[in-house]
């Protein structure tokens, strides 16, 4: 049952403050003292009442805050429940969609595998038919091989004869391949030989041309040498003549020098090989004689005039 604020404070106040009966005394001071005590009790009761009011308000506020928090949590829980239900529905829908996709995929794979097996079966049937036709076509060959095996006891089974035949065929193919390789090598060698011959012919042609040029240069050098030999002979002859002429000139100069010295009555002081000195002496002698003759020529007309 709810209690109003007025009733709550009235009850508390009535419990804490109970009026005491006044004693009938004749003393006014005691009455005054009693009134003061009552006032103090009322003040203390009022303070207690205020404290209780404050405590009650804080309690009510905390209760209200707690109640609001509980309401908020309830709303959050309700939202979480709704979200969880939605999440469960989405998960279930995804699971159902994934399951449907997997079922369709498995069904598609099974259909594809079935089609592949049918195609393979068809191919195997065709291959069996081809093999049967091949066996029928090769049956005469098998009979021939059996008769050949009977005539050649070296081979115990037809497979041995066939293996021998295959060996011979492979050997023949290998020999043919080897022959083709040898032919290719021979063609390559022949081509190299022709190339070398062509190169050698070109080289011989170049060498012949060089030889011809060298022979021509040799002939020209010989002619040039003969020309220089002729010139050298001419130079030697000219040098011999000039040497002879020089010797004669030296002898003439030496004779003139001797004559000059004899004319002067002096001894020979210069070396025989000092041609320039000898010529200088002869030159001075001639100049002196010429000067003397000139003086005589000048003096003779003067004497005649006297």
UniProtKB/Swiss-Prot annotation:
Recorded superkingdom: Eukaryota
Its biological purpose is as follows: May play a role in ciliary/flagellar motility by regulating the assembly and the activity of axonemal inner dynein arm.
Q: Any idea which GO molecular function terms this record carries?
A: dynein complex binding
Tell me the InterPro entries matching this sequence: CFAP_domain-containing, DUF4200
Q: Which classification does the entry list for the species?
A: Eukaryota, Metazoa, Chordata, Craniata, Vertebrata
Give the UniProt keywords, A-Z.
Cell projection, Cilium, Coiled coil, Cytoplasm, Cytoskeleton
The record, for PANTHER family, names: CILIA- AND FLAGELLA-ASSOCIATED PROTEIN 73, COILED-COIL DOMAIN-CONTAINING PROTEIN 42 LIKE-2-LIKE-RELATED
Entry GO CC: axonemal doublet microtubule; motile cilium
**Species of origin:** Mus musculus
Name residues in a coiled coil.
49-139, 197-231
Q: Report whether Cytoplasm shows up as a keyword of the record.
A: yes
Biological process according to GO: cilium movement; inner dynein arm assembly
- Per the record, the gene is Cfap73
Q: What is the official name of this protein in its record?
A: Cilia- and flagella-associated protein 73
Q: Where in the cell is it found?
A: Cytoplasm, Cytoskeleton, Cilium axoneme
The entry assigns this protein to a family as follows: Belongs to the CFAP73 family.
């Amino acid at each position: 049952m709810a209690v109003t604020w007025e009733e709550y404070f009235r009850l508390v106040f009535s419990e804490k403050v109970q009026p005491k009966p006044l004693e009938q005394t004749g003393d006014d001071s005691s009455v005054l003292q009693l009134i003061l005590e009552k006032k103090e009790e009322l003040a203390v009761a009022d303070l207690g009442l205020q404290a209780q009011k404050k405590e009650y308000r804080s309690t009510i506020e905390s209760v209200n805050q707690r109640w609001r928090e509980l309401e908020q949590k309830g709303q959050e829980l309700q939202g979480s429940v709704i979200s969880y239900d939605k999440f469960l529905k989405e998960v279930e829908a995804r699971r159902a969609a994934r399951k449907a996709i997997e079922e369709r995929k498995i069904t598609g794979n099974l259909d594809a595998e079935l089609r592949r097996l049918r195609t393979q079966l068809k191919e195997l049937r065709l291959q069996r038919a081809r093999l049967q036709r091949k066996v029928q076509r090769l049956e005469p060959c098998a009979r021939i091989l059996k008769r050949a095996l009977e005539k050649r006891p070296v081979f115990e089974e037809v497979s041995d004869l066939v293996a021998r035949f295959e060996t011979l065929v492979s050997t023949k193919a290998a020999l043919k391949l080897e022959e083709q390789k040898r032919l290719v090598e021979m063609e390559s060698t022949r081509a190299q030989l022709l190339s070398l011959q062509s190169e050698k012919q070109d080289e011989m042609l170049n060498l012949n041309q060089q030889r011809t040029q060298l022979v021509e240069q040799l002939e020209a050098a010989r002619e040039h040498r003969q020309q220089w030999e002729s010139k050298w002979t001419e130079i030697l002859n000219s040098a011999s003549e000039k040497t002879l002429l020089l010797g004669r000139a030296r002898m003439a100069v030496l004779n003139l020098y001797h004559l000059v010295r004899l004319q002067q009555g002096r001894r020979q002081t210069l070396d025989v090989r000092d041609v320039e000195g000898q010529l200088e002496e002869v030159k001075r002698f001639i100049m002196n004689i010429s000067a003397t003759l000139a003086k005589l020529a000048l003096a003779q007309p003067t004497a005649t005039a006297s």
